Amino acid sequence: WNSKWFDVALEESSEVKVGDRIVRIVSAPFFVALKVEAFEDRGEGDFISSTDFEDISCLFNGREAIVDEIASSERLRGFLAGKFAAYLLQPELEDAVEGFVQTEDDPDLRKRLVLGRFRAVANLMTVAGQA
């Protein structure tokens, strides 16, 4: 699997000591970009059965700052905005997100929150076009 973002994500990753090991942590925007590529490659764009898209949905569900983090990433903003704009046009997207947030206390609220964050990223296309 070839990712156009992997090498850059690794270069810009941070090192964290876990026990007696050092692990590399990529930023949330790079994690999303890598998951988007995996979703479209091995997940074949199947929103409902893709574990990569489930990971994306979970990140958008649980990370309040994700939109701001992506907006701040000059390198990834346009790429991710375009992808999410296209995803929002797919009718099965809402069903997939709904399935991924079913374990939450208020699944409908979480679904709306995730979709709202997807829309906010898609709306960054305007910002990316002006950058």
Regions found by a protein language model. Name each.
Residues 1-131:
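Compositionally biased terminal segments of proteins
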